[in-house]
Amino acid sequence: MTFYDHTAIEPKWQAFWADNHTFKTGTDASKPKFYALDMFPYPSGAGLHVGHPEGYTATDILSRFKRAQGHNVLHPMGWDAFGLPAEQYAMDTGNDPAEFTAENIANFKRQINALGFSYDWDREVNTTDPNYYKWTQWIFTKLYEKGLAYEAEVPVNWVEELGTAIANEEVLPDGTSERGGYPVVRKPMRQWMLKITAYAERLLEDLEEVDWPESIKDMQRNWIGKSTGANVTFKVKDTDKDFTVFTTRPDTLFGATYAVLAPEHALVDAITTADQAEAVADYKRQASLKSDLARTDLAKEKTGVWTGSYAINPVNGNEMPVWIADYVLASYGTGAIMAVPAHDERDWEFAKQFKLDIIPVLEGGNVEEAAFTEDGLHINSDFLDGLDKASAIAKMVEWLEAEGVGNEKVTYRLRDWLFSRQRYWGEPIPIIHWEDGTSTAVPESELPLVLPVTKDIRPSGTGESPLANVTDWLEVTREDGVKGRRETNTMPQWAGSSWYYLRYIDPHNTEKLADEELLKQWLPVDIYVGGAEHAVLHLLYARFWHKVLYDLGVVPTKEPFQKLFNQGMILGTSYRDSRGALVATDKVEKRDGSFFHVETGEELEQAPAKMSKSLKNVVNPDDVVEQYGADTLRVYEMFMGPLDASIAWSEEGLEGSRKFLDRVYRLITTKEITEENSGALDKVYNETVKAVTEQVDQMKFNTAIAQLMVFVNAANKEDKLFSDYAKGFVQLIAPFAPHLGEELWQVLTASGESISYVPWPSYDKSKLVENDVEIVVQIKGKVKAKLVVAKDLSREELQEVALANEKVQAEIAGKDIIKVIAVPNKLVNIVIK
């Protein structure tokens, strides 16, 4: 039986594409543009897994589709190659992280090329290449010049095992580090910060301009966390001190019965009384060991210590004890809160635990039993009594401003971005600290500031990066003899990935980040495909940098990515025992359709789970390509289900996709191809062109493949295949299975040219409608014949055709026809006796 020999055909076409630079980005200014971007990978030692190609295949199908539709297509790939794993490997082995990274990139590239993706490799970028990070450093110097990069002594999330501080976004909900799962402690350190907060409102507003999943927009909105309310100033009794509180509910001020400061608040030591000093100091020490997420966990037990001082409630003169508690963060709001325990669950629990007053100021609920957190009319609130929430807030803000003890205020949950890392394998921050106390940016003419090669890359232990050990790089002298030290912190991995999509547009430019005209031509990115796990971090950082570059006149658009699509996760197969514990696949055997533990004999339940090394359920694309072919892997991953769904990997599904491609190969190579159109496939062919065109455009790849299958089934029923339909079908399947598409195109045309730029097939609307219909002929209410007739025949014509039919004539011979009822396009009913 004829079958598709992927082992010969796929390498042949991969070599053809490489030799002919088939996918070089088009530059014809008269054509529309299409910029299809993948989230570039970190080139790990493990190589690609089958989850990577899912998103890559989607953008590749779109890129091939748009090329055939006459677009200039920019479809690049590169490497997000700085980062901790390479440094960790280097420390463990003594090898240079650059060598390890280069080997990993070569392996990733081999794997990617084996999958037939149509990348323009002339535009490849690597974030660890000095010619690339020259411009990462240049962007940093611009941030510095604009006052958006600054140094501050800040409590950081310090991870002892990693020897570095990490950003808030990299701390998991359980208070451990995203990388490695290590404990995170709070520690004050000199750090570089980026003032992303200066862009909070624009980052929020401009989400309206982009076509992104609403869930991702919501995650960014929540992270930015805009709140409108009021600042209220509280004086500390018997002192000249005061503190400010931000509240979204100034209308509940009459119910504020105590205040809470963050343990790190600057006022704490100044207002703590002598008899409370030891307890306060102990509590501050304990709080410093917890991450922000652990401190604000709603489920945790409430802890706190009284400072011994009282604040004066400005609205009624009542004394309010001032406490410190770790659920209040110095970095959020003003680092101080007014507690209204009657109407806030956390304040209520705290008040109950420490026997503090609870005064209801909203009607409804029983505050002895629980906090009342719904809306109600105001009570116990003097001039606010009887007012609803909106009216009371407005009136209280007016009162605060008139009395000079508060004002209306908008705040954001978003914090400035902690940008420095105490590691070696990252972009050096281009700043020099001089002995006269000044700091300057490295001039543009001296960029890139190249990372020095050194064997000594262990963390210094002092909080500085290993670069502090490289004396000849570290120490510099100015023309006037003043000595200086280079900044030893390096940039986080997020730096290079915050702008890489811009460098793809003009990757070899030595004079500037990218040419303005080219940026105008290609921005914004038309489709960006990647995992939803980057919803806040990477996407927010990239949007921030893009807006800064927009303000500098470097880029012409406010937003970088017009449309974002998150592919789902490809899950592996896992097995669970009766206790619910996961069992590795090499400990499982299949018998009679059931699964059993090899050692215990216990029957196991099969369930999908994230692929992991420990479960031994990771599928390597190399193995799939070798056994089934790249086209099979591509078609299978697109046919599994909707692109954004998480679906379990299945060998049976893979085999089904391979059989489909074999059927396609046989159809084109063994069926007689004719120049005459019998018309039998008119409708299904035109339906297929229409459906595949629309569904690819909407990224509904699974339903597009289903329609291709419909055509193959219909075509296989015919003796011959019309040449134009054969060619059109091959064009439709080529974006999904490009090696097969190229091979079959040569079978049909022998053109010697790639199918890639052959204009996409069009469909004939008139052929979508059936020209013939089947009608039934009933005699005495029973169906006696079925006739295929031209559509829309008149009653008279229909009657004539029915009565002329041989079967009908045999039934009515010798009978009297009483009447004939003809319903066009449906039936003919003959009444006889």
From Swiss-Prot:
HAMAP family: Leu_tRNA_synth_B. It is an enzyme of class 6 (ligase). Transmembrane segments: none annotated. GO terms for cellular component: cytosol. The lineage of its organism: Bacteria, Bacillati, Bacillota, Bacilli, Lactobacillales. This is Leucine--tRNA ligase. ATP binds at residue 613. A motif ('KMSKS' region) lies at residues 610-614. Keywords: Aminoacyl-tRNA synthetase, ATP-binding, Cytoplasm, Ligase, Nucleotide-binding, Protein biosynthesis. Its EC number is 6.1.1.4. A motif ('HIGH' region) lies at residues 41-52. CDD domains: Anticodon_Ia_Leu_BEm, LeuRS_core. It is found in: Cytoplasm.
